[in-house]
Amino acid sequence: MSRLNLTMEVLLVAFVAVFLTSQVHSDEIPYEHLMSQLQACPKECNCPPNFPNAVYCDNKGLKSIPVIPPYTWYLYLQNNLIDVLSANALRNATQLKWINLNRNKITTEGLEVDALRAMSNLVHLYMEDNLLSSIPSPLPAKLEQLRLSRNKISKIPPGVFSGMGHLTLLDLQSNKLQDDAVTEVSLKGLNNLIQINLAKNQLNSMPLGLPPTTTQIFLDGNNIEKIPAEYFKGLPKVASLRLNRNKLANGGIPKNVFNLSSILDLQLSHNQLTEVPVISSGLEHLHLDHNKIKSVNSSDICPPGVLDDHLEEKSPRLRYLRLDGNEIQPPIPRELMTCFRLLRAVVI
């Protein structure tokens, strides 16, 4: 062995020894695996010894995925020119937990069938800003977060979420989904979903088939005109609802559709409302800015009996109210402040 090679070997061993005692992961990686990982690092990428399970291949101008070391947990491939996701490149990466493929050129046709399924331990998949026309299938069964915003997705294949009971977050913002794509059939299998983002699609109606576990629903920037009276009957846990920038008018909102004990955050900005809808006493944040509201009638918005009851524990929970961008003139009605005693901010 040459003196140079010997020196490099000694330095590598010393470097590894230093960082073995200061790993960022709670799960210890065996020494021999760490050595193998560092030595197998693709020449196009960066594998920092202090983050031994991570491989950084972002911003490298890559057109294909290099062969990834077997003990990789976190793989960063964003901001490249990758147009094919091959099973061969990831055949050794069976321990992957997190892969970031944002801002590439991957198409549905360029996604090989078994490329994702082989990653049986994957929990986070980022494929935002690509050229996908359909949701990738089959997906890893342990996946918890799937982020596919800003693609060209127009369809959700039936059964694509079958067996996806671990998925809690589904981000499909800024795609081309229409009403017939989001149904009970297409979403079947999402038994533990918490957040769904369907903002900036081409929906004309409220999406069907959302699981009862859903707590956050983002529907901003669609063409929704009405909400069915019983829509939230099957969604008992919804806490945050965003319907900004739709086409909602008073006629499209049944009187008590938002009078839900679970809802904490309701956003209806940039619609066509002329009146404040009925809200629940548990609501904490209400966004009604940039509508066509001319006045706020406290007797309509205030829950029954509140103005006559001075008990603090029975006060409505509203803390933040936006009414700017309407036709309302200051000052804020006194009855409004009397009703919502916990209000901390009113924008008018």
UniProtKB/Swiss-Prot annotation:
Subcellular location(s) per record: Secreted, Extracellular space, Extracellular matrix
Residue windows of the LRR repeats: 70-92, 93-118, 119-140, 141-163, 165-189, 190-213, 215-234, 235-260, 262-280, 281-303
Tissues in which the protein is found: Expressed in eye, where it is found in the corneal epithelial layer and to a lesser extent in the stromal layer (at protein level).
Top-level taxon in the UniProt lineage: Eukaryota
Coiled-coil region: none
Chain ranges of the LRRNT domain: 40-69
Keywords: Disulfide bond, Extracellular matrix, Glycoprotein, Leucine-rich repeat, Repeat, Secreted, Sensory transduction, Signal, Vision
PTM notes: Glycosylated. Contains keratan sulfate chains.
Residues with attached carbohydrate: N92, N259, N297
Gene3D superfamilies reported in the protein's UniProt record: Ribonuclease Inhibitor
Range of residues in the leader sequence: 1-26
One Gene Ontology biological process: visual perception
Keyword Acyltransferase applies: no
Phenotype reported upon loss of the gene: Morpolino knockdown of the protein results in increased apoptosis in eye, forebrain and midbrain, and reduced survival rate in embryos.
Cystine pairings recorded for this chain: C41-C47, C45-C57, C302-C339
Gene Ontology CC: extracellular space
InterPro entries: Leu-rich_rpt (IPR001611), Leu-rich_rpt_typical-subtyp (IPR003591), LRR_dom_sf (IPR032675), LRRNT (IPR000372), SLRP (IPR050333)
Main localization category: secreted
Pfam families, alphabetized: LRR_8 (PF13855), LRRNT (PF01462)
Family as reported in the entry's similarity comment: Belongs to the small leucine-rich proteoglycan (SLRP) family. SLRP class II subfamily.
Function noted in UniProt: May be important in developing and maintaining corneal transparency and for the structure of the stromal matrix.
The protein, known as: Keratocan
Organism in which the protein naturally occurs: Danio rerio
Gene that specifies this protein: kera
